[in-house]
Amino acid sequence: MSHLAELVASAKAAISQASDVAALDNVRVEYLGKKGHLTLQMTTLRELPPEERPAAGAVINEAKEQVQQALNARKAELESAALNARLAAETIDVSLLGRRIENGGLHPVTRTIDRIESFFGELGFTVATGPEIEDDYHNFDALNIPGHHPARADHDTFWFDTTRLLRTQTSGVQIRTMKAQQPPIRIIAPGRVYRNDYDQTHTPMFHQMEGLIVDTNISFTNLKGTLHDFLRNFFEEDLQIRFRPSYFPFTEPSAEVDVMGKNGKWLEVLGCGMVHPNVLRNVGIDPEVYSGFAFGMGMERLTMLRYGVTDLRSFFENDLRFLKQFK
């Protein structure tokens, strides 16, 4: 058994000299592996008398256990040293300023659309949408604007061909909705519209929202009450509001709505009116039974008035100095 003690001492010396986990594993294989020095000692038991074998086997197992404990202890030391070295190399200077978190924000026009949708949603309106590439029937003819009508010249329309165009208004959504369902109807139709115009108060693409109610016994009084409540909610002021007679081919009577500005001048904010009987007939609704009102407003214009923006083009230039003001 003196030879066994020498093997244990040799193994412990090799273990203490192992500089990393890989070298330590080589020592383990050399002494405790399938053909390791200590493992092979078990084969010598067959040379002993049967009555001596249990005691000799226990001594060999004890030697193997000593080596295994030495391996475990050295492995823990090496892993701890490696961790400390890595932590030292990855030291964080806690005195450095942290990275600033940039929070995004909704575009001011999106804020306006969301605010208006929320208000009318509480009144039972649902949001309806339609295609931006329209045909002249839904954009003009069904809205009481036939081909010879002078109002067509006011739109500066982007035409693809003689029948297809970029919609100049979201009114086509109203037509599609009235054709698809019978009254009562209560919708708002937000979306992008297009007109060939570009200056301080106009862009070729802008956002519009129209509203429509069709039901029995709908009157101009209902229209006025709805828009009064909306404008005072939107601007969060008890505004002075006036309805000024106007003309739109698809409503009769028609009006434009103005609010009194802080400078003492009237500011136009939207157009409205009672749905023209011809429009109702065009979609298969009997104007003798049903009536309705409609209104339309530009989202950029309302946003300009709410936030005091003077140039509509600012909404489309993606200038962060401008957009960050609305976070």
UniProtKB/Swiss-Prot annotation:
One of its GO terms (biological process) is phenylalanyl-tRNA aminoacylation. It comes from the Bacteria. One of its GO terms (molecular function) is ATP binding. The keyword S-adenosyl-L-methionine does not apply. Its EC number is 6.1.1.20. It is an enzyme of class 6 (ligase). Binds 2 magnesium ions per tetramer. Mg(2+) binds at E252. Its cofactor is Mg(2+). Keywords: Aminoacyl-tRNA synthetase, ATP-binding, Cytoplasm, Ligase, Magnesium, Metal-binding, Nucleotide-binding, Protein biosynthesis. It is found in: Cytoplasm. One of its GO terms (cellular component) is cytoplasm. It holds the Pfam family Phe_tRNA-synt_N. InterPro entries: aa-tRNA-synth_II, aa-tRNA-synth_II/BPL/LPL, Phe-tRNA-synth_IIc_asu, Phe-tRNA_ligase_II_N, Phe_tRNA_ligase_alpha1_bac, Phenylalanyl-tRNA_Synthase, tRNA-bd_arm. It catalyses: tRNA(Phe) + L-phenylalanine + ATP = L-phenylalanyl-tRNA(Phe) + AMP + diphosphate + H(+). Belongs to the class-II aminoacyl-tRNA synthetase family. Phe-tRNA synthetase alpha subunit type 1 subfamily. HAMAP family: Phe_tRNA_synth_alpha1. NCBIfam families: pheS. This is Phenylalanine--tRNA ligase alpha subunit. The lineage of its organism: Bacteria, Pseudomonadati, Pseudomonadota, Gammaproteobacteria, Enterobacterales.
